[in-house]
Amino acid sequence: MTKSNNLLADYAAKKQDICIKNDTISDSLFREYGVNRRLRDVNGKGVLTGLTNISEIVSFKTGEDGSSVPCDGQLWYRGYNVKTLTNNLRPGEFGFEKIAYLLLFGQLPSESELAEFTEVLGRSRTLPTNFTRDVIMKAPSKDIMNSMTRSILTLASYDPLVAKAGIDNNIRQCLSLVAIFPMLAVYGYHAYNHYENDQSMYIHRPDPKLSTAENFLRMLRADNQYTELEARVLDMALILHMEHGGGNNSTFTTRVVTSAGTDTYSAIAAAMSSLKGPKHGGANIKVMEMMRDIRSHVKHWDDEDEVRAYLRKMMDGEVFDHKGLIYGMGHAVYSLSDPRERIFRGYVEKLSVAKKRDNEMNLYNTIEKVAPEIIAEKRHIFKGVSPNVDFYSGFVYEMLGIPMELYTPLFAIARIVGWSAHRLEEIVGMNKIIRPAYKSVMKEIE
């Protein structure tokens, strides 16, 4: 740290207690004024703040008496159940591009429309001249989300129509970012790995004829090689992370910032800043850290009682990170099940067999079975507890040889589609800035 940074650090350390004292608001005041903290009710359900035609999450159904009854989770993209969309993919078909078209434009493409869309994306996987050298490689960062965000904001200076209004211009900008996000992520990682870890660096150009999943693996690996199963599993992971309603933190951020009238690059950079937060986009990393801890402390992975005993210690805060949590279990919205996890699980099993890691898959199965029981023993829960998609996604990425630094960027490569769809919907349907109210509880000083 520089002298000025040391000075600031010392000053900040002296001021933190007074900051905490004067910025703490009692929970009783939230109850007194009927304010739902974090825009969630006491059961964790999000407060209704808008309408969307892009997706829907179903976790409860209305009973005969009008009460909410927990049900198996459902995720809908533009009126289609995601389970149906994925089941209807033809043998040999990658689905990311087709479902991206659906989310962006509101209807499934015809054969010719899909071919045109795929070609446009493929031919748009290019960066400005010397951008990789001058921007990505000049300031490598271990935090690839920071690297990508910097690149996104810098790209705005290369766009002569950066602030031009109009749906067509915003579609152009969104599609450009969808196309190049894999490049920003992979190239950012290679630059970091070379300059910080002294590893060999290779920059592979994407193949415009390949899918997003294939290009990601091709650009990441030194030999450009991947199996069809690897690419299909990654394609499914991307599909299941593309969109998850308007209320998730990064998508809501996109809509809030878009409502201010800012440009596409700034709106997506804001969404990236939200997603990089460990409470949002880093869940699968915590699962992987937890699983490594379990593998190192549980001697017999097939012994359900031994696994159960260790998970109880975890819930009691005695082991791992001492926070009393089993990561990858439960969800802010879903109750009985996460539909993404149920779809993804079959792909994970196939990959684990191909990678000869089915013994680890069995450990995941055991945890999936016993963890909800242990959580129910230790906690008062308002709804069911089941594994979410993050429970398996990190395991998949590890089996694919994807470094942990790219786990959250992969989330972004998928979610940029949902962000773009919500940005376009916000531009089309809204002409007022989003401006919620805050109740002041400060004491006036004479």
Question: What residue spans do the PLM features occupy?
Answer:
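Non-transmembrane, aqueous-exposed alpha-helical and coiled segments at domain scale
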Residues: 1-446
